[in-house]
Each structure stands twice: as structure tokens, then as C-alpha cells.
Amino acid sequence: MKTRILTFATAAALLFTAHSAVALTKSTTFNVSSSVAANCTISATDLNFGAYDPLVANKTTALDVNTTVTVLCTKGSNGVTVGLDLGTHGAAANRFMSNGTDSLQYELYSNSAGGTVWSNGGAGLVTWPVFGPIGAGAGTPHTVFGRVPAGQDVSVGSYTDIITATVNF
């Protein structure tokens, strides 16, 4: 009889242990989301006309140079335009570099020197093309054509201006 009680107790203990080892599970779901807003970056390299010679080299020939403005936007950014202001010494619709006492006129163009003036509004805004690979660190460059007109009567000195390039998106 003692053996039967011990066997019964052992069986009961095993049954209880086996029952508690069976775990129940429940599941749920949750949403994952994010949003990507239109965003752009803009950079530009300096434009250096170099030496302007109003007596010989540039007496009848304009001084033409170019630089680049580069824009990188998130994929799907639409209606992106880039404008260039008149600079810190601009007046009316003209751009000028200054040496503090005298001014040297110049202009910036979007298609070629002497073509379409690149401005900050209207027809002078440049509509940016379809953008290349996103996230590759490279943007879409566009050439800025600069021209100092020939035959300007200006004083000796260093002439400078500061242009602000703005990306609208």
C-alpha cells in the first residue's frame, strides 16, 4: 500500500508539472509608419572673374567665366526653382561688384553668357531638372554663366559682391 501511495503521489506531481509547462500565447499587431517631407539643400562655388583689363583685353570684349550651383532634393520634390538675388551691391535690375568707391557691372545668366538673366523671380527663376540618385551625396549641378561687360571705365582695385542663391520647393 505504501508503494501505491508513493506511485500515486509521483504521478500526480508529474501531471501537475507537465500541465504548468504548457504555455499559452496571445498575439497582437501594431502599425509602423513614417513620413518624408520635401527637402532640398543648395551649395555654390565662388565665381572669380580674375583680372579685368578695361584698356586692352576687355576694351571691346566681355569677360566671361562660369561656376556651378548644386541642388539636392528628396525624391518626389516637385516645382523646385532656384533664384539668384542682385547681390549686396545690386541696384534696380543690375548687378555690381564694388571696391568701396567704384562699381564694376556684371551679370549672371542661366543658359549662356548674354542669354537669360538669372534672377530671383519670374522668368529669371531656373526650374530645376529631374533629380538624380537620392542619398548618393551628389546633387544636380547647374552652370551659372557670369559676364563683365566690355569697356567699363573703372578705378584700380579689388571688386567684390555677395550673391544669395535660394532654392524654392
Regions found by a protein language model. Give the residues of each.
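Predominantly extracellular/luminal cell-surface or secreted proteins
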Residues: 85-87, 107-111
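Short beta-strand and strand-turn-strand segments in soluble, beta-rich domains
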Residues: 42-43, 117-127
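Polar, enzyme-active/binding microenvironments
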Residues: 12
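Solvent-exposed strand-loop boundary residues in beta-sheet-rich modules
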Residues: 112-114, 169
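N-terminal signal peptide c-region/cleavage motif recognized by signal peptidases
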Residues: 17-20
